[in-house]
């Protein structure tokens, strides 16, 4: 609908389309990943291994970058309404979406190159083969993902919505409008939902991966194995 109908081509809806596109690509890999876990091997060859692993990273980064840009977009709309007339256009939203995919390619393309299939214990595994020393590049990759796909976006989103709420609060106090007061409460709830959903969805996996990478834990512990 967003692609076909002109009325839907607002900056916000174009960002939503980008989220939907990233999620659709990720969904297309689920049958292969499900089969891998059920069969305990990778029967689909190296080409699909490269595609599936790179799409995972593309989805992670494009989704988070898009959500972050939506926060910046809302901040500009609320705090700088005059600038918003020039910034919040469909053409610029499309350009930003393209830039998001280009930035995500900085991770997605190397992942595609490093993804390989290897025999292991009578099965085939789809894995990332890092340059030597592999432990070092594996650790660097996980730290970079943690910073740029979680910590930095959370900071940007929190700052944007915090400034937006301060602006709306000052407007409400100046006008004393009950309608603006209700609007502030609605937007406050929306902010809590957006930031809360972001943290709830991404924090567990990012924290688990960074702890797994940096902390010396017993990987044979049944609780650790269960968490995997």
UniProtKB/Swiss-Prot annotation:
<keyword id="KW-0675">Receptor</keyword>
<feature type="transmembrane region" description="Helical; Name=3">
    <location>
        <begin position="51"/>
        <end position="72"/>
    </location>
</feature>
<feature type="transmembrane region" description="Helical; Name=6">
    <location>
        <begin position="190"/>
        <end position="212"/>
    </location>
</feature>
<feature type="topological domain" description="Extracellular">
    <location>
        <begin position="115"/>
        <end position="134"/>
    </location>
</feature>
<dbReference type="GO" id="GO:0038003">
    <property type="term" value="P:G protein-coupled opioid receptor signaling pathway"/>
</dbReference>
<keyword id="KW-1003">Cell membrane</keyword>
<dbReference type="GO" id="GO:0038046">
    <property type="term" value="F:G protein-coupled enkephalin receptor activity"/>
</dbReference>
<dbReference type="InterPro" id="IPR000321">
    <property type="entry name" value="Delta_opi_rcpt"/>
</dbReference>
<dbReference type="InterPro" id="IPR000276">
    <property type="entry name" value="GPCR_Rhodpsn"/>
</dbReference>
<feature type="transmembrane region" description="Helical; Name=4">
    <location>
        <begin position="92"/>
        <end position="114"/>
    </location>
</feature>
<keyword id="KW-1015">Disulfide bond</keyword>
<dbReference type="GO" id="GO:0042923">
    <property type="term" value="F:neuropeptide binding"/>
</dbReference>
<dbReference type="GO" id="GO:0043005">
    <property type="term" value="C:neuron projection"/>
</dbReference>
<protein>
    <recommendedName>
        <fullName>Delta-type opioid receptor</fullName>
    </recommendedName>
</protein>
<dbReference type="InterPro" id="IPR017452">
    <property type="entry name" value="GPCR_Rhodpsn_7TM"/>
</dbReference>
<feature type="topological domain" description="Extracellular">
    <location>
        <begin position="213"/>
        <end position="227"/>
    </location>
</feature>
<feature type="topological domain" description="Cytoplasmic">
    <location>
        <begin position="4"/>
        <end position="13"/>
    </location>
</feature>
<comment type="subunit">
    <text>May form homooligomers. Forms a heterodimer with OPRM1. Interacts with GPRASP1. Interacts with RTP4; the interaction promotes cell surface localization of the OPRD1-OPRM1 heterodimer.</text>
</comment>
<comment type="function">
    <text>G-protein coupled receptor that functions as a receptor for endogenous enkephalins and for a subset of other opioids. Ligand binding causes a conformation change that triggers signaling via guanine nucleotide-binding proteins (G proteins) and modulates the activity of down-stream effectors, such as adenylate cyclase. Signaling leads to the inhibition of adenylate cyclase activity. Inhibits neurotransmitter release by reducing calcium ion currents and increasing potassium ion conductance. Plays a role in the perception of pain and in opiate-mediated analgesia.</text>
</comment>
<dbReference type="GO" id="GO:0005886">
    <property type="term" value="C:plasma membrane"/>
</dbReference>
<keyword id="KW-0564">Palmitate</keyword>
<feature type="topological domain" description="Cytoplasmic">
    <location>
        <begin position="73"/>
        <end position="91"/>
    </location>
</feature>
<feature type="transmembrane region" description="Helical; Name=2">
    <location>
        <begin position="14"/>
        <end position="38"/>
    </location>
</feature>
<keyword id="KW-0832">Ubl conjugation</keyword>
<comment type="similarity">
    <text>Belongs to the G-protein coupled receptor 1 family.</text>
</comment>
<dbReference type="GO" id="GO:0007200">
    <property type="term" value="P:phospholipase C-activating G protein-coupled receptor signaling pathway"/>
</dbReference>
<keyword id="KW-0472">Membrane</keyword>
<feature type="transmembrane region" description="Helical; Name=1">
    <location>
        <begin position="1"/>
        <end position="3"/>
    </location>
</feature>
<dbReference type="GO" id="GO:0007218">
    <property type="term" value="P:neuropeptide signaling pathway"/>
</dbReference>
<keyword id="KW-0812">Transmembrane</keyword>
<dbReference type="InterPro" id="IPR001418">
    <property type="entry name" value="Opioid_rcpt"/>
</dbReference>
<keyword id="KW-1133">Transmembrane helix</keyword>
<feature type="topological domain" description="Cytoplasmic">
    <location>
        <begin position="167"/>
        <end position="189"/>
    </location>
</feature>
<keyword id="KW-0807">Transducer</keyword>
<feature type="transmembrane region" description="Helical; Name=5">
    <location>
        <begin position="135"/>
        <end position="166"/>
    </location>
</feature>
<feature type="disulfide bond">
    <location>
        <begin position="49"/>
        <end position="126"/>
    </location>
</feature>
<keyword id="KW-0449">Lipoprotein</keyword>
<dbReference type="Pfam" id="PF00001">
    <property type="entry name" value="7tm_1"/>
</dbReference>
<feature type="topological domain" description="Extracellular">
    <location>
        <begin position="39"/>
        <end position="50"/>
    </location>
</feature>
<keyword id="KW-0297">G-protein coupled receptor</keyword>
């Amino acid at each position: 609908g967003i692609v076909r109908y002109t009325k839907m081509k607002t900056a916000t809806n174009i960002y939503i389309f980008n989220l939907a596109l990233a999620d659709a690509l990720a969904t297309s890999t689920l049958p292969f990943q499900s089969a891998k876990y059920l069969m305990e091997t990778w029967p689909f060859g190296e080409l699909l291994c490269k595609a599936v692993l790179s799409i995972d990273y593309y989805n992670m980064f494009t989704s988070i970058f898009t959500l972050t840009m939506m926060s910046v977009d809302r901040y500009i709309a609320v705090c700088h309404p005059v600038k918003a007339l020039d910034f919040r256009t469909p053409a610029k939203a499309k350009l930003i979406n393209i830039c998001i995919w280009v930035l995500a390619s900085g991770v997605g393309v190397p992942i595609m190159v490093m993804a390989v299939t290897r025999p292991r214990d009578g099965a085939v595994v789809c894995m990332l083969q890092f340059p030597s020393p592999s432990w070092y590049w594996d650790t660097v990759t996980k730290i970079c993902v943690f910073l740029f796909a979680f910590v930095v976006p959370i900071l940007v989103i929190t700052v944007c919505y915090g400034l937006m709420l301060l602006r709306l609060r000052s407007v409400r106090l100046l006008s004393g409008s009950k309608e603006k007061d209700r609007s502030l409460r609605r937007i406050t709830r929306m902010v809590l939902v957006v930031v809360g959903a972001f943290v709830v969805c991404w924090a567990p996996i990012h924290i688990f991966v960074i702890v797994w990478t940096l902390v010396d834990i017993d990987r044979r512990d049944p609780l650790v194995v269960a968490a995997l």
